[in-house]
From Swiss-Prot:
Its main location: cytoplasm. This is E3 ubiquitin-protein ligase XIAP. GO terms for molecular function: cysteine-type endopeptidase inhibitor activity; cysteine-type endopeptidase inhibitor activity involved in apoptotic process; identical protein binding; protease binding; protein serine/threonine kinase binding; scaffold protein binding; ubiquitin protein ligase activity; ubiquitin-protein transferase activity. The gene is Xiap. GO terms for biological process: cellular response to hydrogen peroxide; defense response to bacterium; DNA damage response; negative regulation of apoptotic process; negative regulation of neuron apoptotic process; negative regulation of tumor necrosis factor-mediated signaling pathway; neuron apoptotic process; nucleotide-binding oligomerization domain containing 1 signaling pathway. It comes from Rattus norvegicus (Rat). The lineage of its organism: Eukaryota, Metazoa, Chordata, Craniata, Vertebrata. It catalyses: S-ubiquitinyl-[E2 ubiquitin-conjugating enzyme]-L-cysteine + [acceptor protein]-L-lysine = [E2 ubiquitin-conjugating enzyme]-L-cysteine + N(6)-ubiquitinyl-[acceptor protein]-L-lysine.
Length: 496
């Protein structure tokens, strides 16, 4: 949580006391937020519940009771927490109005400062556990509030410290969920068994309503920035046998794959007359030794190999990105460093990265792409994985960025299929001597809805993947007009 007690808070000249009595009611406070910026990371309802009125200037709010003003709200801020910091003697914060029988349409969270309420950012509902009752916890989840009690024991669920244990909870993970169990488990989350709701084993925070472009690590950090697991703190617990349960990663092992290269001096010798752009000393310090084939290197401990180095690439960074479970990496750089690398590097960067061209590493790249929720959704629609991978790689090569929405990916896949189809039929078209006007007419017909023949096609049917109707006609059908398959989902796309 970010808090600036000097720049973002101040005390304002007290207003009319009689007028203040009007705002004892939360509903009356909420009405002042009619023109409050919708882009604010803290919602109007949360601020009103914390005793604030909107001043009409920027995101500045003012307490109706103590008249302290706060502005410059940031993601993760607690409305009640900031209120209490700048005005610890505020009568509202200290429960004066409750003790005197004032009616207050607020959750029990604010009374006597028992809980600290925070807003829900974006479309994700989330909260921390350890509540007095599951009923109250469900209420907080529905209303998008966060309750954070800092004096609790971490991790909240020691039985879920192991990534393998978390993975086992996803046996009944719903098909409609956009993220893969592997990605969620790696981010410290396990399945609660309710809808697509997951929970962090460490901080107890819950997340649900996942969207196609969400990344588990990013959402975990955005909503629970103080989680010890996200921060890379040591949250390992002792098992019944007394052995520490470390966080599990692929390729993690306590003994090095190549003990002969365990020493820096042994690794640096292998580079000889190294002529490549990346610094050989940095490579050796990061655990790598040269294989004598181009710029291929391999880690002595985890056995992970990398090649095709670029001048700007950092060996430690690439080590953490590709082989986060390496024990040597963990010992040298710490869990927080590894977490930050995975939070700041997108899938797109890892796709263009050409790792050592061995079957195992190639499979690792393919697995990474396959786990992308957008890719899985496209496969469900009937698109071929090779076509999806090729389209994503072309996007990265031409624009330098990855797809940010499923709609754009689907549109490009459909466009690529049409291009291929046109290429294959070009020779036949020439042989049949079809006129330019006829070709244009056919292309225009291809874009038209096959039901009304008036509007352009705009909907892909799942699971068959057929693209045949406009949005209006799609609403009237339950089965695909092409193959009669029952439609389970209708995905809107944009045709260029």
């Amino acid at each position: 949580m970010t808090f600036n007690s000097f720049e973002g808070s101040r005390t304002v000249v007290p207003a009319d006391t009689n007028k203040d009595e009007e705002f004892v009611e939360e509903f009356n406070r909420l009405k002042t937020f009619a023109n409050f910026p919708s882009s604010s990371p803290v919602s109007a309802s949360t601020l009103a519940r914390a005793g604030f009125l909107y001043t009409g200037e920027g995101d500045t709010v003012q307490c109706f009771s103590c008249h302290a003003a706060v502005d410059r709200w940031q993601y993760g801020d607690s409305a009640v927490g900031r209120h209490r910091r700048i005005s610890p003697n505020c009568r509202f914060i200290n429960g004066f109005y409750f003790e005197n029988g004032a009616t207050q349409s607020t959750s029990p969270g604010i009374q006597n400062g028992q809980y600290k309420s925070e807003n829900c950012v974006g479309n994700r509902n989330h909260f921390a556990l350890d509540r007095p009752s599951e009923t109250h916890a469900d209420y907080l989840l529905r209303t998008g509030q966060v309750v954070d009690i800092s004096d609790t024991i971490y991790p909240r669920n020691p039985a879920m410290c192991s990534e393998e244990a978390r993975l086992k909870t996803f046996q009944n993970w719903p098909d409609y969920a956009h993220l893969s169990p592997r990605e969620l488990a790696s981010a410290g989350l396990y399945y609660t068994g309710i809808d697509d709701q997951v929970q962090c084993f460490c901080c107890g925070g819950k997340l649900k309503n996942w969207e196609p472009c969400d990344r588990a690590w990013s959402e975990h950090r955005r909503h629970f920035p103080n989680c010890f697991f996200v921060l890379g703190r040591n949250v390992n617990v002792r098992s019944e046998s007394g052995v520490s349960s470390d966080r599990n990663f692929p390729n993690s092992t306590n003994s090095p794959r190549n003990p002969a290269m365990a020493e820096y001096d042994a690794r640096i010798v292998t580079f000889g007359t190294w002529l490549y752009s990346v610094n050989k000393e940095q490579l050796a310090r990061a655990g790598f030794y040269a294989l004598g084939e181009g710029d291929k290197v391999k880690c002595f401990h985890c056995g992970g190999g990398l090649t095709d180095w670029k001048p700007s690439e950092d060996p430690w960074e690439q080590h953490a990105k590709w082989y986060p479970g390496c024990k040597y990496l963990l010992d040298e750089k710490g869990q927080e460093y590894i977490n930050n690398i995975h939070l700041t590097h997108s899938l797109g960067e890892s796709v263009v990265r050409t790792a050592e061209k061995t079957p195992s590493v190639t499979k690792k790249i393919d697995d990474t792409i396959f786990q992308n929720p957008m890719v899985q959704e496209a496969i469900r629609m009937g698109f071929n994985f090779k076509d999806i991978k090729k389209t994503m790689e072309e996007k990265l090569q031409t624009s330098g960025s990855n797809y940010l929405s499923l709609e754009v990916l689907i549109a490009d896949l459909v466009s690529a299929q049409k291009d291929n189809s046109q290429d294959e039929s070009s020779q036949t078209s020439l042989q049949k001597d079809i006129s330019t006007e006829e070709q244009l007419r056919r292309l225009q017909e291809e874009k038209l809805c096959k039901i009304c023949m008036d509007r352009n096609i705009a909907i892909v049917f799942v699971p068959c993947g057929h693209l045949v109707t406009c949005k209006q006609c799609a609403e009237a059908v339950d089965k695909c007009p092409m193959c009669c398959t029952v439609i389970t989902f209708k995905q809107k796309i944009f045709m260029s």
